[in-house]
Amino acid sequence: MRPADTWKDYELLDATEGNRLERWGETILIRPDPQVVWKTPKQSPLWAKADAVYHRSNQGGGEWEYRRRLPEKWKISCGEGEEKLTLIVSPTGFKHTGVFPEQAVNWAWYQQKIRAAGRPVKVLNLFGYTGGATLACAAAGATVCHVDASKGIVAWGKDNAVASGLADRPIRWLVDDCAKFVAREKRRGNTYDGIIMDPPSYGRGPGGEIWKLEDCIYDLVTQCEEVLSDKPLFFAVNSYTTGLSPAVMEYMLKTTLVPRFGGKTSCDEIGLPVSATGGVVPCGATAIWEE
């Protein structure tokens, strides 16, 4: 398990009975988490002082119960110095806030690889969401192409770039279907030194294209192999679904990339440390190929 344990503006205070108690800056939120199957006693007094609670609906989705008036959005920071990112938090109707804090452990890893390369690095970030990984790579000096199917989410990413003081960095922000974009990049002869992929379990492209993780992931990985440069640095695949284990993702990268590029693969869960107990809540997994 690789814990994201360097946050100051985010904290997983406690977790029990299917819920997380979280601090986002000065705001306390309670959100459901299907991984939290244990029913241990609540350790934090802040359970009773949460500013907002997300309630799931039996029909799917859910809604927020606000116990005090909150701003529509606010900012939190991650990292320090040149690698500091400032990200906009806003509770959405799908329980998310615009930031997956567990990914900070990956952001730091990407930055280390880019800085150590000692050469210009081009990164492709697919299913890039609100741009945490994109901005981490850009802050480390990379040229980045960010692709997501949601126009609103890409706009959020651009706002994060402004908040982080990175709006002038070489970032292309694209609203597109990831598989179609990669196919076009192959035809154009464009290549990348690093690829990051953060695919959802299920989704739709801007043209109504259907994405189902288990059915589509291998084809996309093999397509991406063809847009890697001659001397790539890394290829990272993140997964949030329990149906795709870290070992399965690593196997795909090992059999697809190692025969051509050499290098090595690894995989592990990523998670968030719980302040009240010292345990770590698993939040997904990452498989990595690196030179």
Where would I find each of the regions flagged by the language model?
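S-adenosylmethionine
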Residues: 178-258
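Short beta->alpha hinge that forms the Motif I/post-I loop of the SAM-binding pocket
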Residues: 128, 148-152, 216
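C-terminal catalytic and target-recognition region of SAM-dependent MTase-like enzymes
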Residues: 232-291
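Conserved alpha-helix/loop element of class I SAM-dependent methyltransferases that forms part
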Residues: 101-118
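Conserved SAM-binding loop of SAM-dependent methyltransferases across substrates and taxa
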Residues: 130-144
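S-adenosyl-L-methionine
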Residues: 150-196
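Conserved class I S-adenosyl-L-methionine
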Residues: 118-129
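Non-catalytic substrate-recognition/targeting regions of SAM-dependent transferases
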Residues: 8-22, 29-101, 108
